[in-house]
UniProtKB/Swiss-Prot annotation:
Cellular location(s): Cytoplasm
Cross-referenced Pfam families: RecA, RecA_C
Record flagged with keyword DNA damage: yes
HAMAP family: RecA (MF_00268)
The protein's name in its UniProt record: Protein RecA
CDD domains noted in UniProt: RecA (cd00983)
Transmembrane segments: none
Protein species of origin: Brucella anthropi (strain ATCC 49188 / DSM 6882 / CCUG 24695 / JCM 21032 / LMG 3331 / NBRC 15819 / NCTC 12168 / Alc 37)
Family: Belongs to the RecA family.
Molecular functions per Gene Ontology: ATP binding; ATP hydrolysis activity; ATP-dependent DNA damage sensor activity; damaged DNA binding; single-stranded DNA binding
Encoding gene, per UniProt annotation: recA
Described purpose of this protein according to its UniProt entry: Can catalyze the hydrolysis of ATP in the presence of single-stranded DNA, the ATP-dependent uptake of single-stranded DNA by duplex DNA, and the ATP-dependent hybridization of homologous single-stranded DNAs. It interacts with LexA causing its activation and leading to its autocatalytic cleavage.
């Protein structure tokens, strides 16, 4: 009885293998070679290429060393919180690696002088200032499908105005129009983005939901589609000012990884954004170095490998700016211990502050 049962299973498995092979060959004949494959036989597919964000602590918090290529990323936050700055830093890092980048400026507010200061190569940056939301997303789709773009930024979702709204009267009520536009565009874009290995960053604004009694009243514009399609969502906030004497020279910024499909989410980091200079890399090296024990702090003095960096944080930052080889050494050590730093020293912000679980009407 057991022999018959065993023979039956063997015959059944052979039949299943033959049936599967026939199905695979039929799919490949209908849709082309590579339309279906065994994942284990194509190991490079698993490797996820990333682009640094310009912030060492954020790269570590993301768990994979930066923002992922071939995925959709959403950066949202209040006004003047550093959303465009973070996107421009990512473009600059991609260009350093030889990548081609594009910027769809729906807000018509890109400052080329500031972008150059952040390290963006303006001569090789493609820029579009579309008239309507449909035009912006059509340009995005065409650039992505070309397969030549490495990073594409759309600034911002809130400024993607549907054609019907532009052609209508000022007081016309057109509920859900922008949400439908985004939903349709993302359905088209997702497969192209993955195939072309292009990272698309959507910058988004915050609105307030009316009549919310419990939970956060904040929501992002453009409906719910972007929340689902995005592999990474970053919530960026200004939490304070940096002063030199009485003059404000920068912002203290907090970024929370609200969603991450590639590593554990909810990591939270803080760094400085200096006016006219962007993310303060030396400030991050000092702060992360102290947390990880790479940089020693004794009273107000900072030192590295028994070498004094300076008295006070600002003096230590200036020393690293004047001695880039020491800064590179500290950065290399921190990147090598990224996993330990992310696990032990970066704050876990928790899932409670997820802006916009409900679509804006």
């Amino acid at each position: 009885m057991s022999q018959n049962s065993l023979r039956l299973v063997e015959e059944n498995s052979v039949d299943k293998t033959k049936a599967l092979d026939a199905a695979l060959s039929q799919i490949e004949r209908a849709f082309g070679k590579g339309s279906i494959m065994r994942l284990g036989k194509n190991a490079p597919v698993i490797e996820i290429e990333t682009v640094p964000t310009g912030s060492l602590s954020l790269d570590i918090a993301l768990g994979v060393g930066g923002l992922p290529k071939g995925r959709i990323v959403e950066i949202y936050g209040p006004e003047s919180s550093g959303k465009t700055t973070l996107a421009l830093h990512t473009i600059a890092e991609a260009q350093k690696k030889g990548g081609i980048c594009a910027f769809v400026d729906a807000e018509h507010a890109l400052d080329p002088v500031y972008a150059r200061k952040l390290g963006v190569d303006l001569e090789n940056l493609l820029i579009s200032q579309p008239d309507t939301g449909e035009q912006a997303l059509e340009i995005t789709d065409t650039l992505v499908r070309s397969g030549a773009i490495d990073v594409l930024v759309v600034d911002s979702v809130a400024a993607l105005t549907p054609r019907a709204e532009i052609e209508g009267e000022m007081g016309d009520s057109l509920p859900g129009l922008q949400a439908r536009l985004m939903s349709q565009a993302l359905r088209k874009l997702t497969a192209s983005i993955s195939r072309s290995n292009c990272m698309v960053i959507f910058i988004n604004q915050i609105r307030m939901k009316i009549g919310v009694m419990f939970g956060s009243p904040e929501t992002t514009t453009g409906g719910n589609a972007l929340k689902f399609y995005a592999s990474v969502r970053l919530d960026i906030r200004r939490i304070g000012s940096i002063k030199e004497r009485d003059e404000v020279v920068g912002n203290q910024t907090r970024v929370k990884v609200v969603k991450n499909k590639l590593a554990p989410p909810f990591k939270q980091v803080e760094f400085d954004i200096m006016y006219g200079a962007g993310v303060s890399k030396t400030g991050e090296l000092v702060d992360l170095g102290v947390k990880a024990g790479v940089v020693e702090k004794s009273g107000a003095w900072f030192s590295y490998n028994s070498q004094r960096l300076g008295q006070g944080r600002e003096n230590a930052k200036q020393y690293l700016k004047d001695n880039p080889e020491v800064a590179r050494e500290i950065e290399t050590t921190l990147r090598q211990n990224a996993g330990l730093i992310a696990e032990q020293f970066l704050e876990d912000g928790g899932p409670e502050d997820d802006a916009g679980d409900a679509a804006e009407m």
